[in-house]
Amino acid sequence: MSDKKVRARFAPSPTGQLHVGNARTALFNWLFARQQGGTMILRIEDTDLERSEARYEQQLLDDLKWMGINWDEGPDVGGPFPPYRQSDKIDVYREHAERLVAEGKAYYCFCSQADLDAYREQALKDHRPPIYPGTCRSVDPAEAKRRRDSGEAGAIRLRIPERPIRFHDIVHGDVEFSNEVVSDPIILRSSGVPVYNYVVVVDDAEMQITHVIRGDDHLSNTPKQVALYEALGWAVPEFAHLSTILGPDRERLSKRHGATSIATFREMGVLPEALVNYIALLGWAPTGGTREIFRPEELVKEFDLRRVTPSPAIFDFEKLYWLNRHYIKEAATYRIAKLARHYWDRMMIDKIAHRVGMPKLDPIHVAQWGASNEVDEWLSKVTALVVPSVNKLDELPERGKVFFDYDAAAALANPDNAEVLAAPKTTDVLAAFTTRIANESAPLTAERFKAIVNEVKTETGVKGKDLFHPIRIAVTGTHSGPEFDKLVPLIEEGASLNLPIAVKSVKERVAEFASARN
């Protein structure tokens, strides 16, 4: 690799959300720049004015920052090579294109779209590469000027040299393209709008980019870009084309596989350090060993572009969620409690909307249901209790059903509970347990609940799962879940709070269960 100070860039188009593939490209550029002590540049490629939107640009910036990816130069922080937004330098692209025409390295093409379609169709019929046949290559410059002056629209095409185009790729090695399969590319449309393959070269050269790290879907664009660098008299940067990311079915990763955008993973409750850790391992591996857990600072230290593989990477959702579970467990309790509040709020909003018969309820209608220290503290404790069993934070409401969704009739009808409820000793256990709970007048503590269970054990002679499973079903609706010594006090505390969706106390639950069972 070059000895020049590294200048790497991520250049997204603000035409949609940031997806896994582009996020990996951004991450690898960032890791490489930071590992090499170089400069990270963010450039917005928004020449597609019809599809580019400010909201997408802001979302891109937000997602990158959420991932921990920062930049030294960009549209929001400035830098020595402005502007960092392509739409602000259209005139620059036109000037360079006209210079190429003046030097005979490019020419005006007057072929209509119908002509181009006909060329392509015939080439395919003849089993030839469907490249532009060079119809306007020989048009005399004076004739081209006359036609343009008369109002005829013309695009500008680069003259591809009549020789193979070669370049070295850090991932793929030495690459060669025959000029017989590379068309003279349009660099400036007849409308005056420059095309991607052209503007990216101008920008990379003017911003002194030393390494172009991007997806291998751009590999076929590279010979045209190399030819442009040479025609413009600029140094060709080093290239590293990252492998394709495939879904579990070995097809190109897409929405049909599930979440693919960073915004969606964020909403699902995937932590940034988990996503960064996982994406970094898509097509790259550290030197030696089988280690899988890497903090961002460790990734920076370990990252080496030469260890990026050209083989496709498989996106394993379960592996990502396994990593996320690891990072959730390692995260500070207060941080997870703060993040979890979003999911509890959304759950409560949905429940209230369902209760009042509305398909959707704005958060303002919840009247700040948890705007109290007592509710905050209780939710933090609930989160701490159930979060070890989740892979993503959006699973919290499902685990929280033990507090908010107690339904005795549903518990009795649940086939998973059938074997326990039909056991010979269950009736005696539930009768003794129900009687004792009914006689309690104060909220149950962990110690008092344990004492009651021991009394039932002594009275009935039943122990182990034959004792605990029926009691758990009566209290929670299911025969598995958190330990009673932590669960029962939280149920009782929740029942004492003024929540819009009430938490039933243990006494209320057991009475409801007994009534439904009789």
From Swiss-Prot:
Its EC number is 6.1.1.17. The keyword Cell cycle does not apply. A motif ('HIGH' region) lies at residues 12-22. It comes from the Bacteria. A motif ('KMSKS' region) lies at residues 252-256. ATP binds at residue 255. One of its GO terms (biological process) is glutamyl-tRNA aminoacylation. GO terms for molecular function: ATP binding; glutamate-tRNA ligase activity; tRNA binding; zinc ion binding. One of its GO terms (cellular component) is cytosol. PROSITE patterns: AA_TRNA_LIGASE_I. Residues 130-150 are annotated as: Disordered. Keywords: Aminoacyl-tRNA synthetase, ATP-binding, Cytoplasm, Ligase, Nucleotide-binding, Protein biosynthesis. It is an enzyme of class 6 (ligase). Pfam families: Anticodon_2 (PF19269), tRNA-synt_1c (PF00749). CDD domains: GluRS_core. Residues 140-150 have a biased composition (Basic and acidic residues). Belongs to the class-I aminoacyl-tRNA synthetase family. Glutamate--tRNA ligase type 1 subfamily. Monomer. Catalyzes the attachment of glutamate to tRNA(Glu) in a two-step reaction: glutamate is first activated by ATP to form Glu-AMP and then transferred to the acceptor end of tRNA(Glu). This is Glutamate--tRNA ligase 1. It comes from Koribacter versatilis (strain Ellin345).
